[in-house]
Design a protein with these regions (language model features):
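Noncatalytic, basic helical substrate-engagement surface that gates or grips nucleic-acid strands
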Residues: 2-6, 17-157, 161-184, 188-189, ...
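Non-catalytic nucleic-acid-binding/docking modules located in mid-to-C-terminal regions
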Residues: 2-3, 9, 17, 21-23, ...
Length: 306
């Protein structure tokens, strides 16, 4: 880990920013997040998206590799890994059958494109990491904490706001947020780096409060309702005053009117939503971080795909 300095008044150690800035950088990529953005960038601008002359879909491969190379060029990482979801039900879906049940069906030509992409990544010797029963976000959270424990800085590439809960610049973790990885037609719009200030400007809360924020107001994109009747503005107001969900419920007597009633009725919903939103840092993954060091490509794997 980067060095810390200790102040003379025995206050907590302060991270040494100069040491952190020279620490090796690991880029962690939310594979499905970038893949879907790549797919829809071209599907919307071209009827049927990109294809080879023989009809093989290539929107995902083209857009993903294009963005990957641009991130590598701009960030110059020492190591990289990409996490993908798996087809198996996750522990969240087992706990709640309605979790992500609002998602539209995956386009038919997306899956073969993903398969070809993962073969391309294998040829580039970039680790593709999955964990059945867990989401890619959980894999990324676990990898990020393993990486900082081994002295890396970490930048997570994703368009999923759930990953904002990982942001901790004092530990060396930021998110390269794909608010618009592509413009219409595939023109590149680069990711924006999110630290504490950016997350707070976007959501109104700090990264450490993201889980409790979503526990209160829910997350429609994942079909998580949160506490009925508590919207984003109320969630932000409560967290600014009480800091955490637990503190809010410990202070119900000081909360008046309809908000108090909604919180009382929705306590179990808040706890359930928090369980669904919280990323796991103990995801079982079978990889040594040394395997994430950048390596040369494997021509024998790449040739049949090009």
């Amino acid at each position: 880990m980067p060095r810390s300095t200790t102040t003379s008044d025995n206050s907590p150690p302060v991270p040494d920013d100069s040491a952190m800035a020279t620490s090796p950088l690991m880029i962690l990529i939310d594979g499905h997040s970038l893949a879907f953005r790549s797919y829809f960038a071209f599907a919307k601008s071209r009827q049927g998206g990109l294809r080879t002359k023989t009809g093989i879909p290539t929107s995902v491969c083209f857009g993903f590799i294009k963005s990957l190379l641009e991130v590598m060029e701009s960030e110059n990482p020492n190591a990289i890994a990409i996490a993908f979801d798996t087809k198996e039900a996750t522990f969240r879906q087992q706990a709640d059958a309605t979790y992500k049940a609002n998602r539209t069906e995956t386009p038919e030509d997306f899956l073969p494109d993903i398969k070809n992409l993962q073969q391309l990544l294998e040829g580039l010797r970039i680790p593709v990491i999955t964990s059945p029963g867990y989401e890619a976000d959980d894999v990324l959270a676990t990898l990020a904490h393993q990486a900082i424990d081994q002295g890396y800085r970490v930048k997570v590439v994703s368009g999923d706001r759930d990953l904002f809960q990982l942001v901790a610049p004092d530990k060396g973790i930021t998110v390269l947020y794909l608010s618009g990885a592509f413009a219409r037609g595939g023109a590149t719009v680069g990711p924006t780096e999110y630290g504490l200030e950016e997350v707070e400007a976007k959501l109104g809360v700090l990264p450490s409060q993201v889980v409790d924020y979503k526990a209160l107001c829910g997350d429609p994109s994942d079909n998580i309702p949160g506490v009925k009747g508590i919207g984003a503005k109320t969630a932000v107001k409560l967290l600014k005053e009480y800091q955490t969900l637990d503190n809010i419920y410990a202070s119900l007597d000081s909360i008046k009117g309809a908000v108090k009633k909604k919180l009382e009725v929705g306590k179990l919903d808040a706890e359930h939503a928090r369980y669904l939103v919280q990323l796991r840092f103990d995801t079982p993954i079978d990889i040594d971080l040394d395997q994430c060091q950048l390596q040369g490509f494997d021509p024998q794997v790449l040739k049949p795909l090009l």
